[in-house]
């Protein structure tokens, strides 16, 4: 196997490019119905999910999805102590391809955060990244990528070889949009 068929990232950000408050809480101002429908619709076709210890996608299917849980608390890889379908993975100790092979799935990998996880996959290489924007303000929060807010999330994606492939309005009343980013 070696790599997923595709690596897709999903994030909704505030005006400042934040995905959560400083204390790692995703506020209600980012939990918008239209974006949640888009997000869970995308996850429906994913073979597995990648997330950090403090984040997950929620929803009724979350517990059943195979997943890579990125952590620095182990040297390489280990079975998740509470989830037989999950693998703890330290990117500093093991290549992504080895972790993916050990997960024993094939298909799309959906990356759902948090900031360090989104940043790690910038280097591994997203095939697609769906960046939703909400008009919420979260000053001094947790950024979607390293380097935000000094740079915009869009600038970070561009610096990693991604190009905008169009923006869709998810909900005009709440001013929520999603931009699809793909390889240049």
Label the predicted regions.
Residues 1-184:
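Enzymes that bind and transform nitrogen-containing heteroaromatic metabolites
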């Amino acid at each position: 196997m070696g790599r997923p068929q595709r690596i897709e990232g999903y994030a909704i950000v505030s005006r400042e490019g934040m995905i959560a408050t400083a204390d790692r809480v995703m506020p209600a101002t980012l939990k918008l119905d239209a974006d949640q429908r888009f997000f869970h619709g995308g996850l429906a076709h994913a073979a597995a999910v990648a997330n950090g210890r403090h984040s997950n996608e929620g929803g009724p299917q979350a517990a059943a999805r195979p997943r890579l849980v990125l952590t620095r608390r182990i040297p390489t890889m280990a079975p998740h102590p509470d989830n037989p379908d999950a693998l703890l993975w330290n990117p500093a100790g093991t290549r992504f391809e080895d972790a993916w092979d050990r997960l024993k799935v094939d298909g799309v990998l959906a990356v759902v955060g948090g900031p360090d996880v989104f940043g790690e996959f910038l280097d591994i290489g997203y095939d697609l990244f769906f960046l939703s924007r909400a008009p919420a303000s979260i000053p001094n929060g947790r950024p979607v990528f390293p380097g935000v807010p000094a740079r915009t999330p869009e600038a970070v994606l561009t610096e990693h070889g991604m190009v905008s492939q169009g923006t869709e309005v998810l909900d005009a009343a709440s001013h929520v949009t999603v931009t699809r980013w793909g390889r240049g």
